[in-house]
């Protein structure tokens, strides 16, 4: 049975444009090789028939419900995006209609819980390796943005418990992730890593655009003007500090700046216009450097750096967890074989061994229904039920040994 995945991500104002580009495939992704461009036209939105401007749509939702005149804080969480999905094997078992029903039923559940009027978008991506839905919830409650109250710890637990339960009732073969299991930890870390890579891509694109705009403005301001001038310098005599034979101080002629230039009127007027235009452009650049763009650029750079660091940590954590799980799996497999050998050596026949081992496995199953030991036993039983010549020969050897032991025991009794 596959696991249900619902992950919540907070979005502030400067995040919306980037996630809009990603969700609506408005720009080519450089860091997500999983996107199949030839299938991007199959993506769809359960809320909007056409592409939208995320900032405008979110603003409409807030303004239509807001109570009072207080402005929304610049650093407020405007959208809580839910990413709804499962593993690839789950979707491979569903035909296209059932896949769409899965996302439609998920959307209905969240629209009922958080208010249909608060759902800004519900974009389904089928052009990546695993289909998934980005569902944007504007956390409005009682006329105010209340992200912390709408999506508190209890609500996140509700998402993890009730979503798979609800989808099971609708006929989907899903279960909640095992609490505290290594599998859940690895899957969550992997999903976070993929999501962070997408966020980095979006932030880098946004940063690149803003840098380009600043570069264009700077070039316009710093452009050099070639000005035809006259009488910029004049010839003057200056003392050399030496005297001739008659004692008269010697002088030399040099070109010295007059501090003035003579321009044609048309050149002068053109220069005035360019100076004014340059002053206006310089003012715009100064405003950009001292206000929103510069601050946002610095914020984006910092966030990209933090995301890269987090991404690296998650990759390292994934590696450690995979290694740990691999070691544990090997240890459990060895323990399983040793347990069978131990019990087999202390029972008289195959039937007694099977009964005793079955009781032992049953007790383990009560403590850990989906533990590695139980799963190893299930794999062993499946393999045992598969007919092979090697199994027949092994069974024949066991029967021969049993008959030999019985004959020896009978012979000893007769003596």
Curated annotation (Swiss-Prot):
Keyword Protease: no
Regions of compositional bias (Basic and acidic residues) in chain numbering: 23-39
GO molecular function (one): DNA binding
InterPro entries given in the database record: Mob_Pre
Lineage top rank: taxon: Bacteria
Keywords annotated in UniProt: DNA-binding, Plasmid
A single BP term in Gene Ontology: DNA recombination
Function as written in the Swiss-Prot or TrEMBL entry: The interaction of the RSA site and the pre protein may not only serve a function in plasmid maintenance, but also contribute to the distribution of small antibiotic resistance plasmids among Gram-positive bacteria.
Similarity-based family: Belongs to the plasmid mobilization pre family.
Protein name (Swiss-Prot/TrEMBL): Plasmid recombination enzyme
Species of provenance: Bacillus sp
């Amino acid at each position: 049975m596959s696991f249900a995945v619902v992950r919540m991500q907070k979005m502030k104002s400067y995040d919306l444009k980037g996630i809009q580009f990603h969700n609506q495939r408005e720009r080519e992704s450089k860091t997500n090789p999983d996107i199949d461009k030839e299938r991007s036209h199959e993506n769809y939105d359960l809320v909007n028939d056409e592409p939208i401007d995320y900032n405008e749509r979110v603003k409409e939702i807030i303004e239509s419900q807001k109570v009072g005149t207080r402005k929304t804080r610049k650093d407020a969480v405007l959208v809580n995006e839910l990413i709804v999905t499962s593993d690839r094997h789950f979707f491979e078992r569903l035909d296209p209609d059932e896949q769409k029903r899965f996302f439609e039923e998920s959307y209905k559940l969240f629209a009922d819980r958080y208010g249909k009027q608060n759902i800004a978008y519900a974009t389904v991506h089928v052009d990546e390796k695993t289909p998934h839905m980005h569902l944007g919830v504007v956390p409005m409650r009682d006329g105010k943005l209340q992200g912390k109250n709408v999506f508190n710890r209890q609500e996140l637990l509700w998402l993890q418990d009730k979503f798979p339960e609800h989808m099971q009732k609708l006929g989907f073969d899903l279960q909640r992730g095992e609490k505290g299991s290594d599998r859940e930890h690895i899957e969550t870390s992997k999903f976070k890593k993929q999501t962070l890579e997408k966020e980095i891509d979006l932030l880098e694109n946004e940063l690149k655009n803003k840098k380009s705009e600043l570069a264009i403005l700077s070039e316009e301001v710093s452009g050099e003007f070639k000005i035809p001038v006259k009488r910029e310098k004049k010839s003057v005599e200056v003392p050399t500090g030496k005297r001739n034979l008659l004692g008269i101080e010697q002088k030399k002629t040099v070109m010295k700046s007059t501090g003035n230039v003579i321009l044609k009127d048309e050149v002068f007027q053109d220069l005035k216009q360019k100076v004014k235009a340059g002053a206006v452009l310089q003012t715009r650049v100064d405003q950009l450097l001292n206000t929103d763009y510069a601050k946002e650029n610095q914020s984006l750079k910092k966030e990209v750096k933090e995301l890269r660091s987090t991404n690296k940590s998650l990759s390292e954590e994934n590696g450690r967890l995979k290694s740990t799980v691999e070691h544990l799996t090997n240890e459990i497999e060895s323990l399983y074989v040793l347990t069978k050998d131990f019990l087999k050596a202390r029972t008289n026949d195959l039937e007694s061994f099977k009964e005793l081992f079955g009781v032992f496995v049953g007790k383990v199953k009560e403590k850990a229904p989906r533990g590695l030991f139980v799963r190893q036993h299930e794999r062993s039983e499946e393999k045992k039920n598969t007919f092979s010549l090697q199994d027949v020969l092994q069974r024949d050897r066991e029967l021969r040994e049993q008959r030999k032991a019985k004959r020896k025991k009978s012979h000893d009794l007769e003596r």
